[in-house]
Amino acid sequence: FTTTDLDGKPVKLSDYRGKVVVLDFWATWCGPCLASMPHTNEVAAHYKDEGVVVLGSCTNDTRAAFEKWVKANREKYPDFVFTHDAAEKSPASVSLKLYGVNGIPQQFVIDREGKIAALVNGYLKGEVLLEGALAKAGIKVDPKIVAQAEIDQKKRDATK
């Protein structure tokens, strides 16, 4: 897929083949999306030497809102590559058309071969589901953190 960065340049998922990509679908109006960003950035910074990159793809939002938000906040999130889906709120959006996203935040962890290794739906402060997802993509994650991610997921599953 292709989205565009703040400067309007195309950003392709295929450009990151060989890396583990956290494809993070978010919007400027989504409170849980914004709440998840500090943790996602910390995780990206911690694992970037292992080839982890975060593509923060703004979806269901206007280009103007995206540009305003990124200009005001990008320094807080140096380990994000922020992009915008030109289809904005249409059914042709990358998030809906290619990934079936019907709620945000959603993070797809894509392995080095370009295959989806794991999915994290939503965000609750203190959870380590993203780290567990990275482990499924072949990233070396502390076994204690992986065990905690499994506990976090079981707690979520129990409340469904």
Task: Name each model-derived stretch.
Residues 1-14, 79-84, 89, 129:
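N-terminal "domain-start" segment that seeds a small globular fold
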Residues 106-160:
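Thiol-/selenol-based redox modules, centered on thioredoxin-like
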Residues 17, 25-45:
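Conserved redox-active cysteine motifs that mediate thiol-disulfide chemistry
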Residues 20-21, 52, 105:
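Alpha/beta-hydrolase fold active-site loops
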Residues 70-113:
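Short, internal strand/loop/helix patches
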Residues 49-65, 77-90:
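Thiol-based oxidoreductase modules, predominantly thioredoxin-like and allied folds used
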Residues 16-19, 49, 77, 101:
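Active-site acidic short loop of glycosyltransferases
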